[in-house]
From Swiss-Prot:
This is Alginate lyase. Its main location: periplasm. It comes from Pseudomonas aeruginosa (strain ATCC 15692 / DSM 22644 / CIP 104116 / JCM 14847 / LMG 12228 / 1C / PRS 101 / PAO1). Disruption phenotype: Deletion of algL is lethal, and microscopic examination of the cells reveals that alginate or a precursor accumulates in the periplasmic space until the cells burst. Gene3D superfamilies: Chondroitin AC/alginate lyase. InterPro entries: Alginate_lyase (IPR022859), Alginate_lyase_dom (IPR008397), Chondroitin_lyas (IPR008929). It catalyses: Eliminative cleavage of alginate to give oligosaccharides with 4-deoxy-alpha-L-erythro-hex-4-enuronosyl groups at their non-reducing ends and beta-D-mannuronate at their reducing end. Keywords: Lyase, Periplasm, Signal. Its EC number is 4.2.2.3. The gene is algL. Residues 1-27 form the signal peptide.
Length: 367
């Protein structure tokens, strides 16, 4: 305390104020956007039976790539390899989708059985040390970060709900949050130190999973890492709003530009409520990227000129692929055309973002 007092005396007023503000920021608990504080819905009926927990995945995270045999663009699916991949990861995706669905059901209906079931699923995987294998390839570490983002994002709704549903489940909550923290630390190791040419949407999704985990576990180090990864991503966006590493995906370049937006918009929204404004990073890179994507959806000609390929629009016809519009339009005052695109596709439900995205980002416009 004595040292702090001397510093305050010695420093000029403005610098001292900045230092003190920084100290307060560092000490403050990490929080989610306001929608995560929503109360649990009024109890409706009784919960059905709890489905069996998917077997905790504790094996090697070495999986077949669905693009196996493709060239460097990694843009052509290998149907046989994809079938193998889906079989290998079934327990993981069943866990992601199932746990998120249980949390959603509970938040809507208030049925204690759904809450107990969701927590039993997550604590079973936590106790087993699922997804923690040190034996992994690129596809395996990708599944680890996707699953962490899905599960921690869904759990966050329980953690911060004003109804305090976890108050009677302290032991299970501790097990689950400790597991998330271990996975978050591993994801940081998995995705740190990559050369710029290797940093693409995978790194952005890793950063989202770490941001979600940071808030759930109140880990400032994880929060800082996620913010730093966002800044790397923002500085990859060129003056026209393109991501050079996603242009490499040729016929899927537009789809992958769109796929890069959900994690980046979520990170920026979470950073904002914790006192870190990322909107102006690289002269408004996130906004340039979003506007470039929406223009491309309306007319893919610019992407075709950039890549020399007709764009595969299959994914872009799926409404939930635009779930990023919710956090984005909470950050920015979206123009009428973008708001209309959002309204036409709502409500958004994305298990990789923790479930009901529209429910937790209901305010239109931004500051």
């Amino acid at each position: 305390m004595k040292t702090s007092h001397l510093i305050r005396i010695a420093l000029p007023g403005a610098l001292a104020a900045a230092l003190l503000a920084s100290q307060v920021s560092q000490a403050a608990d990490l929080v989610p956007p306001p929608g995560y504080y929503a109360a649990v819905g009024e109890r409706k009926g009784s919960a059905g039976s709890c489905p069996a927990v998917p077997p905790p995945y504790t094996g090697s995270l070495v999986f077949t790539s669905k693009y196996e045999g493709s060239d460097s663009a990694r843009a052509t699916l290998n149907v046989k390899a994809e079938k193998t991949f889906r079989s290998q990861i079934k327990d993981i995706t069943d866990m992601e989708r199932g746990a998120t669905k249980l949390v959603t059901q509970y938040m809507r209906s208030g049925r204690d059985g759904d809450l107990a079931c969701a927590l039993n699923w997550m604590s079973a995987w936590a106790r087993a040390g699922a997804l923690q294998s040190d034996d992994f390839n690129h596809t395996g570490k990708s599944m680890r970060k996707w699953a962490l983002g899905s599960l921690s994002g869904a759990y966050m709704r329980l953690k911060f709900s004003s109804s305090r549903p976890l108050a009677a489940h302290a032991e299970q909550s501790r097990e689950i949050e400790d597991w998330f923290a271990r996975l978050g630390t591993q994801v940081v190791r998995d995705w740190s130190g990559l050369p710029l040419k290797k940093i693409n949407n995978h790194s952005y999704w890793a950063a989202w999973s770490v941001m979600s985990t940071a808030v759930v576990t109140n880990r400032r180090d994880l929060f800082d890492w996620a913010v730093s990864e966002f800044k790397v991503a923002a500085n990859q966006v060129d003056e026209q709003g393109f991501l050079p590493n996603e242009l490499k995906r040729r016929q899927r370049a537009l789809a992958y530009h769109n796929y890069a937006l959900p994690p980046l918009a979520m990170i920026a929204a979470f950073a904002q409520v914790n006192g870190v404004d990322l909107r102006q990073e690289n002269h408004g890179a996130l906004q340039r990227l979003a506007e470039r994507v929406m223009k491309g959806v309306d007319d893919e000609e610019t992407f075709e000129e950039k890549t020399g390929e007709d764009q595969d629009m299959t994914d872009l016809k799926v409404d939930n692929k635009y779930a990023w519009l919710e956090p984005y339009c909470a950050l920015y005052r979206c123009e009428p055309k973008m708001l209309e695109a959002k309204k036409d596709r709502e409500p958004f439900n994305s298990f990789r973002l923790g479930g009901e995205v529209t429910r937790v980002f209901s305010r239109e416009g931004g500051s």
